Regions:
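Local beta-strand/beta-hairpin segments that build beta-sheet-rich folds
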Residues: 1-3, 43, 118-124, 155
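Short strand-turn-strand beta-turns centered on an Asx-Gly dipeptide
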Residues: 149-153
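Short tryptophan-centered beta-strand motifs in secreted/extracellular beta-sheet-rich domains
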Residues: 4, 70-72, 132-148
Length: 190
């Protein structure tokens, strides 16, 4: 588990680098106090740039892996264009990775492949994603199989072989989403 509780409020999260897919301004990632979070602190993306094709990334710096099981609690706090939070895996750079994301404005969970900065949906499910409530999003990548879970229940699996090698793991948001992240767990699989 990433030690968010040891991070300094008001500062960028330690052990992360930052990038953006698409257009618009860079994301603004900071550690914020939140009494509803397990650790009392969260990693939050606070930029409200409404550019539609804009995906801020907070990349954990110490996990290059192909096979991983990633889970994070997130809360969509605000956003007029979007209220989304997600997990990116096998991230080669800001324009090449896989992402599972949930969107409280659209009430859905989607799994995408991002190649050369362009998203392509591989799988998805429509379900209630309540804003301003904690939800748990999971993404397991093993070989060519990707399994997405939401609030502890498996939603769907997809297969793809575009990115087979090791890559980074990141937190992800879209457009003007103000999203908080808590209990970020990364398990490298054999």
């Amino acid at each position: 588990m990433i030690a968010i509780d040891r991070m300094t409020p008001g500062s960028p999260p330690a052990g992360f680098s930052f990038a953006r897919t698409g257009q618009g301004s860079e994301g603004k990632w900071t550690v914020t106090e939140d009494r509803t979070a397990a650790a009392g602190k969260v990693i939050e993306q606070t930029s409200t740039d409404r550019t539609d094709y804009r995906f801020p990334l907070a990349i954990h710096e110490n996990v290059p892996a192909a096979n991983v099981d990633v889970e994070v609690r997130f809360k969509a706090v605000a956003g007029k264009t979007d209220q989304a939070g997600g997990i990116a895996v096998r991230l080669l750079d800001a324009d090449n990775y896989y992402v599972a994301r949930a969107n409280a404005l659209e009430d859905n969970v989607r799994f995408y492949r991002v190649v050369a900065g362009r998203r392509e949906q591989l799988e998805g499910a429509n379900l209630r994603v309540s804003p301003n409530e904690w939800h748990t999003l999971g993404l397991r990548a093993e070989g060519q199989r990707f399994t997405v879970s939401f609030d502890g229940k498996k939603l769907f699996s997809a297969t793809d072989k575009t990115f087979a090698g090791a890559g980074g793991v990141a937190l992800w948001t879209k457009s003007d989403s103000v999203t908080r992240f808590d209990q970020f767990k990364i398990t490298v699989l054999p």
